């Protein structure tokens, strides 16, 4: 699942994609100013007293590893934190706990609820956040099933099973789950070409690679993409670098 690559901390327990450092993109959705109001809760005691930040990158080129702009900040107190403010348009930001990236948040009109605990991170209260975290839950389910098959194959190997035996036991199911996971990514991005979710999740996908690369999955996404999506600063820069 795609959220933020973490250091060895106890307050986020994620499948493999959640360990990836993510980039952040802000995208125009409407010409009207958007007002965000975020009420956050956390059951993780180690976060108490820490500063929480909403960060974004102004041009789509910077990454979490380099420079990001701090849009808003507050301190976690007794498991509660809050943000409120105005932005020119709906955009995707990243929630940080001091230097640690926690999760993406779509800044959209309305009262948003953010939950951070050791089991999951979620945002609710706005249509785009609801859609994003529904996708994350499905992605998480597939990742967990894939992880369990990998664990099963390791147990079989330690028990003396041959590679052929392991492949017969888990290979077909594993391949099916991997296809479903890839198809889920492609479907979500293509269905959201015209709003911040499409380029945002595309960026989360691309962040798993050490350098820009054109994969079959990325090709499937961009081959039918409209100009609006391809003109996004991150998407445009990534494709230019990957095609060199």
Ranges and model annotations:
Residues 1-42:
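Bacterial Sec-dependent N-terminal signal peptides
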Residues 190-244:
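Charged, long alpha-helical assembly modules
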Residues 32-175:
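A non-transmembrane, solvent-exposed segment enriched in polar/low-complexity residues
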Residues 155-172, 176-179, 183-198, 216:
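Surface-exposed, polar/charged faces of alpha-helical domains
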Residues 130, 137, 183, 200-203:
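Positions in alpha-helical segments
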